[in-house]
Curated annotation (Swiss-Prot):
Cellular compartments annotated: Cytoplasm
Family indicated by similarity: Belongs to the CoaE family.
Organism: Synechococcus sp. (strain CC9605)
The protein's name: Dephospho-CoA kinase
Entry function: Catalyzes the phosphorylation of the 3'-hydroxyl group of dephosphocoenzyme A to form coenzyme A.
Amino acid sequence: MAPGEPFSQRRIGLTGGIASGKSSVGRWLAQQGLPVLDADQFAREALAPGHPATNSVMQRYGSTVRAEATEAIDRAALGRIVFHDPAERRWLEHLIHPIVRERFDQALSLHADTPAVVLMIPLLFEAGLESLCSEIWLVDCDESQQLERLIARDGLSPKAAQARIAAQWPLNQKRGLADHVVANQGHPGAWQPQARELLKMSPTAEL
């Protein structure tokens, strides 16, 4: 939890490495009735056709990232650029992160009277968004599992998958920054009892 005034609202920051299982935990939290604000969704919307950020990306990369016969961005082509060039990744993050932060502020205002909300943010620590959260849950798995899951999920080569993992802070660095670590090393859904106990906790317990 970031230092400062205590929140009147429980704000669960849900993060973890790529392919660690954040989305599964996020879907489960939504099934428990919590609004889930999704940074990835906000980022996708920011790069929709006609948006200012989309125009900036098109101006920088041109037809290389333009989906055939449309004004949309070919996200796979953009990924091949930014996950293999740290300077280009930083440029894109500097473009998108302020937009995502603004969308979170807007969404949190809409949910101001909701007792608890979830902020699902893959790059929570990298983007410095800890101050939005009253507590942070890290969905954790072994690095080897992370690689295997990413290759299977996205059909990537091992090299391409490693590049995407390397673009984020390592899980062992994030473990020490989270308030709670949700273990996702076992079979699918093995994390649910732990998540259920965390959800039942007082928002201020152990923080």
